[in-house]
Amino acid sequence: HRVDRRQRQMCIRDRYNGLVQLDDGLNIQPSIAKSWTISEDGLTYTFNLRDDVFFHDDMAFPNKKGRKVVAEDFVYSFERVWKGSINSPGGWIFKGRVAEENPFQAIDNQTFMLRLVKSFRPMLGILTMQYCSVVPNEAVEKYGADFRKNPVGTGPFKFKRWLENQSLFLTKNKNYFEKENGQTLPYLDGVRVSFVGDRKTAYLELIAGKTDFMSGLESSFVNELLSSDGELLSKQSEKLTFLKSPFLNSEYLGIRFNGEANNPLVNKKIRQALNYGFDREKMLRTMRNKVGKPANSGFTPIGLPSFSYKKAKGYNFNPDKARQLLSEAGFSNGKGLPTIELLSTKDYEDLCTFIARQWEDIGVKVQIELEESATLREKMKNGQASFFRGSWIADYPDAESFLTVFYGKNPAPPNYTQFKNVAFDAIYEEALNENDDTKRYALYNQMDKILIEEAPVVFLFYDETAWFVKKGISGLSKNAINLLSLKKVKK
């Protein structure tokens, strides 16, 4: 079974396990932890571990046989991330959240305890992330900096071989602990991950039958796969299956708030005019073949339980309203309004050009400047981008993961717009301490209403996954975090 390079991070999940995992509905399910309890104050999490989970067989162990996972392994694995002993981008998950002294404790071999500084309802969701996977200290100490080239986990597939920038080979873990209908997983004997340089190449290899799976689309080939209504073309339907579902990714144009005083976007009416001034439905139909939904209910995307079209009503296409707002801002028909510079990357040039042309009709002129992805991210981080194309993908399945982007005390990232709003911040802090989901979701809706009113971004669309799977393959299921798990796949 082969996949393209976009799935490399996804395949990490099939080499490791954590305490808990997500199902396709983004509900928390047991993994190595078979059960857990949370104290009434929300500060202490106690996990009861399975006693039939073993690390992959490896040279790091006596007789090359993987040993049983115990609670102390989670203490070790979490402390590696928390203390920064590894160059992990996941250090933030525990920072400021766990107790300063002994936050991770092994009560006995099968009982692991985690202690927080203050209650944080999304914590279980965070524990599903790959950073919270368990690893054996023996392998980390044996391989040192080369552990990434010799990974040892507990997942359904184990590392076999890596040809850098070419291929990653995984093989079946015959000692894996999960079963389906009494049969031990996984079903596949192995996986080959091909490191393809770009999506166009991935598409060509998929069509040629060299790969079995591809995720994502680009304008260079989207019309070869999908109709303008988002349906798989008949010429492809004999060879491929198309799977589409909500993806927790909000696409937007960000506006830096503490920018130059002469920047017209400091005027809220102009920001609102931009949001009214283009047709999201047409944009998605003509530019993305209906992969995605118009972002007309705030920043929190479809796919989260707190999402509501009714409770947070955003912007629709209303050019007359846009012109009225421009007039109220002192720029009737755009007269006197300077050209606005929009920073983007090459892969979003077509989409930004579409929007800019529609804005011309209401009197707003936009000049698109293209940057390399790394350069644009650096400018966003350093406050050098006044108007920029951005996206935000959920780290964990809770709206807090999106709303934190606008919390005034956060740096860039995640707060690239440097948005500060006293009311928003107060509600955000209240939501962090609210353990009742219904009440917390209501607070999330209030924050989205503030974002709609203040318009620190131009809301573009809520993304959707686009998976193309070779006929004859079963067991792949759709989920809103775009996770690829191969443990139940059959070919």
PLM regions: where:
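A structural "hinge/loop" feature
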Residues: R5-Q9, R13, I32, M59-N63, ...
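N-terminal lobe/hinge region of extracytoplasmic solute-binding protein
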Residues: R5-Q9, R13-E40, E79, I86, ...
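Aromatic- and charge-enriched surface segment that lines or borders ligand/interaction sites
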Residues: K34-N87, M113, A202-E205, P264-L265
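Surface-exposed binding/hinge segments that line
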Residues: T37, E72-D73, R80-N137, R161-L163
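Aromatic-rich, solvent-exposed beta-strand/loop patch
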Residues: H56, R115-S133, R148-T201, L225-S250, ...
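Detector for C-terminal structural segments
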Residues: R121, L163-S167, L243, E251, ...
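Structural transition elements
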Residues: F157, N262, K268, K293-A329, ...
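A bilobed periplasmic-binding-protein/Venus flytrap-type ligand-binding module shared by bacterial periplasmic
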Residues: T171-F177, S245-A273, G277, T286
